[in-house]
Amino acid sequence: MRLLHISDWHLGRVTYTCPRSPDHDRVIREITDIARDFRPHLICHTGDVFDSLRPSYPDLIRGVDALQALAAIAPVLVVCGNHDSPALFRLFATLLGKRSRLHFIDSARPPEIGGVLEFPGAKAEIIRIAPLPFVHGNRFVDAFEDSSTWMATYADRIQRIEDALGRGLTDGFDPSRHILIFAAHLHVTGAVFSGSERALHVTDTYASRLERIPQVSYAAFGHIHRPQPLPGSVTGWYAGSPIPLDFGERDEKKLVVAVEAEPSRPALIKTHELSGGRPLRRLAGTLEELQSLAPTVGDALCVVTARTKQPMSDLDDRIRELFPAATLLNVSEDCAARQLSVLGARDAPSESEPSFSEMFREYLAAEGTRGAEADSVLRTFDSLIRCVEQENEPLFPEMAALQRTLEESLP
């Protein structure tokens, strides 16, 4: 039996203000090519097809078209993730019908009413798979829970569901034919995060117990974006996201998991690396230092910090010239002229309160300025303070020049 495990596409993701659809299109083509070469008997997507509960129309089309293309290669089982909409998955399942090779699982079900599914494997093999979509901590799964579980911990609730699905997998189990698979969108204790996961749903409150996973040939997990084997001795993987969804994932190798298993024998696991779409880069340095990096940047999505001596009004244009093929997510300037040194204790009288100018200098040293040179801003501030103290009207050369221009322009 051959199974291809994919997960956490997050179609519709935007990084800064940049849609990631070109990157998704690239890796989905790669995944489809891998599936054609591998020729699996089943493709399992362990959740978060979409990045939001209400995906846009283009993202809906992108997701359904991609899954339909995979379903032309092998049956596809899609488990609902915490970013997916169970209602949308139910709609998909209704529209596709029971004869479709594309199966959307919106919620956990008891084994006796569809909680364990079977698919043909090689020769006389039968793949038995128990899917467990994401379970929200504040919602009850009616088929598994009642008032006695209201005060149970999240881990206890998940354990109750896993135990029931485990019993369903082994009911009538034939070790010469059946290959057991568990597919879930869950956080298990010991998994390593990327940092881009929805923070609430990867806290200890949402941690489930690894040791209570049903005994299976392979456990396919989604929810954690860093590809990794399951911790401990369980044979299984988090397939992870196919592209780096934010800068916390920029150094991760993205992949899909290919599984080969036979009845009563350990599964063989091989990973296939993906390009990950356009890389994410953080670049910092002087213009000369940034120029030296240009050959390595290519079409990356970049956050750039340029260190300059004086403010540069054309900085964005200069950076675009350095990286013409890159997408600039953000360009910021670290300008020496906008920074002031912080006054120390030796710079002030030992028993005096700091003056307004001293406090403003300290502020500028920490925050800098948006455009003007810091020394010029400080001189203007000092002039204003003196005018207030002497009860004089502030008068600056720039204001006088503007006043003369206005007077000369009047008839």
PLM feature spans:
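His/Asp/Glu-rich metal-coordinating catalytic cores
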Residues: 55, 64, 69, 77-234
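Active-site glycine- and acidic-residue-rich loops that bind
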Residues: 155-161, 248-250, 309
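Binuclear metal-dependent phosphoesterase catalytic core
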Residues: 113-127, 132, 236-301
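Accessory, non-catalytic peripheral segments of nucleic-acid enzymes
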Residues: 260-411
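N-terminal active-site segment of His-dependent metallophosphoesterases
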Residues: 1-72, 383, 387, 410
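Short coil/turn segments at beta-strand junctions that form active-site/ligand-binding loops
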Residues: 1, 39-41, 74, 125, ...
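Divalent metal-coordination and catalytic microenvironments
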Residues: 8, 28, 43, 48, ...
